[in-house]
């Protein structure tokens, strides 16, 4: 468990906001880090691992034309994933207040020519939407770990807005 996850849960809890997580390259690691914190269930509604490109469209509602034109590693894809997961994990007809997403290339190869370590993180809150691009280095595990930490920092920054 991480201090970043504890800080995210505390910040969301202070606002009375809930969280949904959509992951691609992190493969559930972000959600696992969050649920390692006792009391996470007061904030986290759920998560989706949309690893395959078609799942981003069918489950999270990412635009098929966007995926066809730009592939799964794109800032707009990250934004649509973050927005889509809010509805997917919503309870009682109400979406999660905050959605966060990770999409990128952990390596060792790049299927679409973008550099290994390219990561886009999307965050959608009731007051703002944002994506941030990162270029991490290291092996597959290091890139995934850096993406998890960056996603948590991005949620904290967005919640502070």
Predicted regions located by residue number:
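Short alpha-helical segments enriched in small residues
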Residues: 1-161
């Amino acid at each position: 468990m991480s201090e970043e996850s504890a800080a995210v849960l505390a910040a969301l809890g202070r606002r009375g906001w809930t969280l949904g997580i959509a992951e691609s390259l992190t493969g559930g690691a972000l959600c696992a880090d969050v649920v390692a914190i006792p009391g996470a269930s007061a904030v986290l509604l759920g998560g989706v691992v949309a690893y395959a490109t078609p799942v981003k469209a069918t489950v999270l509602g990412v635009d098929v034309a966007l995926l066809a034109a730009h592939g799964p590693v794109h800032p707009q894809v990250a934004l649509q994933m973050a927005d889509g997961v809010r509805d997917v994990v919503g309870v009682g007809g109400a979406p999660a207040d905050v959605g966060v997403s990770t999409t990128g290339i952990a390596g060792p190869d790049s299927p679409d020519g973008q550099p290994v370590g390219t990561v886009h993180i999307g965050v959608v809150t009731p007051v703002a939407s944002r994506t941030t691009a990162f270029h991490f280095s290291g092996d597959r595990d290091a890139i995934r770990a850096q993406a998890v930490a960056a996603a948590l920092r991005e949620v904290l920054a967005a919640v502070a807005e």
